[in-house]
Each structure stands twice: as structure tokens, then as C-alpha cells.
Amino acid sequence: MQPVLECEIFVENASGLELPELAIAPWENHLQRWLPELTAALPPADGYELTLRFTTDAEIHNLNHQYRHKDQPTDVLSFAALEDNFASPLPPGEPLYLGDIIVSVETAQRQAQERQHSLQTELGWLVSHGLLHLLGWDHPDEARLIEMLDRQAVLLRNVQLIP
């Protein structure tokens, strides 16, 4: 059994939609379960923090344009707070802020319908993808994308979002 890792998860619903799939507690629980499995490559810390924001196509379009120079909405954006050469130890008791995951609920709804699975499952794919990006994963080629998708599938199975 893994030791309990202190994780502070901030979940915001800015989508304007009141859907059971956007309830805060399940996402806090999923991220609390996923983080201890993924922290081996992170600098040691007494705990970790991140923000998950559910939003609209309009907001994610603006962010995608501002930060990635792509004038269109996207499904998920990640803004990692970690730097590659993170070397200085944190003060005792201070959590390490990992960054922000932003998910467009409108795009997730369309993709769930196209992929013929639930919105909850699609959100799981997007949130886990964003989390891996916060932790330094990337997919510059097909092989790395497959590796990332395989890892996401493990995470989703661990919280029963996929069989």
C-alpha cells in the first residue's frame, strides 16, 4: 500500500452547465488516486497542488489563441508550473504547485458522442491527458502518443471510468 500523499485539488466549473459529470468530489477523488502513481519523476514534496477547470469552448478558444496561437477551441489545455531544472527544495510543509488543467465541456460532449462513450469517460480521458502533460509527458510522435494513451487507460481503469 502506498503512503498517503497530500494533494490539494481545486476544481472549478465555469462551463455554465450543471451536470452530474462535473461534480467536484469525484474529480478530486480521481486526481487524488492518480497523483501518487505518477509522482516518481517529480521533485520530492510534502504535497502537491493543481487546478482543474471545466469551461466553455469560448474560454478555451481564447486561451488556445493567446498561449498556443491557434485560433480555435480545443478539448484540453495544460499549463505546467514546473520547470525542467527544478532543483531548490521547498520549505517544509509547502506543497508543490503542478499547474492548471482546463477542459472544454462543450468539446468533450461532442467528442463523447462521436466516440460513443459517456461524457464522464471523455472527461476522464481529457483530465488524465492534461495531468500527464503537467507532469512532463508529451507526444511529439506516434510512439509517445501511444505510450501516453496507454498510461491514461491505466489511470481510467483504476477509477472505473473504463473496463
Swiss-Prot record:
Q: Name one GO cellular component term.
A: cytoplasm
Phosphoprotein listed as a keyword: no
This chain is encoded by the gene named ybeY
Q: Which cofactor does it need?
A: Zn(2+)
In the record, the note on similarity to other proteins reads: Belongs to the endoribonuclease YbeY family.
Going by the entry's taxonomy, the superkingdom of the source organism is recorded as Bacteria
Q: Quote the InterPro entries the UniProt record gives.
A: MetalPrtase_cat_dom_sf_prd, YbeY, YbeY_CS
Root EC class? hydrolase
The protein's location, in the record's own words, is: Cytoplasm
Q: What broad class describes the main subcellular location of this protein?
A: cytoplasm
Q: What is this protein called?
A: Endoribonuclease YbeY
What this protein is reported to do is described as: Single strand-specific metallo-endoribonuclease involved in late-stage 70S ribosome quality control and in maturation of the 3' terminus of the 16S rRNA.
- EC number(s) recorded for this UniProt protein: 3.1.-.-
Q: Enumerate the GO terms in the molecular function aspect.
A: metalloendopeptidase activity; RNA endonuclease activity; zinc ion binding
Q: Per the record, a Pfam family?
A: YbeY
Answer yes or no on keyword Nuclease. Answer: yes
